[in-house]
Amino acid sequence: MKKIKFYETSKLNKKYENNFIKNIKKINQSGRYILGQNVNIFEKKLADYCKSKYCVAVGNCVDAMKITFMAYKINGDLKDGDEVLVPANTYIASILGITSVNLKPVFVEPDPETFNICTKKIQTKINKKTKAILAVDLYGRPADLFALKKIAKKKKIKLIEDAAQSLGAKIKTS
């Protein structure tokens, strides 16, 4: 059996190395490691790139998921014990973000072609406790957001997208 090598990001990142090291030195010399000017610049640039009014940088995916789900709970859209459909092959951070605010993850098998949450299998998991779908975009490929939006609208549940691995990806509209 032939071994398939895991993708080596070091090769992809090599062209950014000098700039990365220069900026790390600059931050290290400033003594400001939390918030500060660099975070403000990053948030502004990312908001502009995403054509969004706002951007809030967080330390990791667990924090991002936790803040998102907490906001829905504060708004009254979610409550303790509500179920969130999530891809079975997602990273643990998705699950920790859900469980850390007393919500229940319900695993949905991935689509074998895209490895994203399977829109057909989602239908079998939705019940009266289901209040949200967490679409986790994997390997640079967005989930089928058109189908997921239709399902969420029809079932009157929330759709949350974790696009950390697909930032900048485009979805065909025709």
Each predicted region: which residue ranges?
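N-terminal "arm"/small-domain region of PLP-dependent enzymes with the aminotransferase-like
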Residues: M1-R32, Q37
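PLP-dependent aminotransferase class I/II
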Residues: S10, K22, V39-K45, Y49-C55, ...
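Phosphate-binding glycine-rich loop
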Residues: R32, G36-E83, G97-V101, F107
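Conserved coil-to-alpha-helix start sites within the AMP-binding
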Residues: N89-I95
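Active-site phosphate-binding strand-loop segment of PLP-dependent enzymes
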Residues: E113-S174
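Short beta-strand->loop structural element characteristic of the AMP-binding/adenylate-forming
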Residues: K104-T114
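Structured catalytic cores of enzymes that bind and process phosphorylated ligands/cofactors
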Residues: E8, Y54-A57, T99, V108, ...
